């Protein structure tokens, strides 16, 4: 992060703590769900000018249920090469800690919220009833009870591993 000219961060308030800890003075700009399209245009323009940019997220891997997909898409369309530093996405970390079968799995990211799109949520849950592979989902804490209830109704007595705060101080796994 010291070697790039600009850091695009999901939440600059969060990322500044990490940068300060390591005394990294690289300028930052925000890149998140709510500005991803217009900010990607800006970042692609900067890349065309020869600016080296790193994209970081609060946790996990950019583009895997975190901002990044739009920027990579626009870079590809502009013929700009993108590289990724290997590191675990939360879904892979959770899978490896779950105790569930890891050979074949299905990653669904976040289910649509009931409030936003109840029919689409139910359609996905109905599809998951037929899924035999280990299923990985993300969920926000304030939706967790409702989602677990819906999963129990849709999937029955299927084994579950609930992982939270992975790689952080309060990491926990419940099976």
Each predicted region: which residue ranges?
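Class I S-adenosyl-L-methionine
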Residues: 2-85, 93
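RNA substrate-binding interface of SAM-dependent RNA methyltransferases
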Residues: 6-9, 13-24, 91-100, 105-106, ...
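Amphipathic alpha-helical transducer elements in NTP-driven molecular machines
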Residues: 12, 40, 88, 118-125, ...
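Short hydrophobic/aromatic-enriched beta-strand-loop microsegments
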Residues: 25-33, 82-83, 102-109, 157-163
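Short, well-ordered secondary-structure micro-motifs
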Residues: 41, 66, 94-96, 147-149, ...
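A contiguous loop/helix-start segment that scaffolds small-molecule binding in enzyme catalytic cores
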Residues: 51-52, 133-134, 138-175
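Short beta-strands and strand-loop turn motifs
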Residues: 53-58, 104, 108-109, 132, ...
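Class I SAM-dependent methyltransferase SAM-binding "motif I" and its flanking Rossmann-like core
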Residues: 70-131
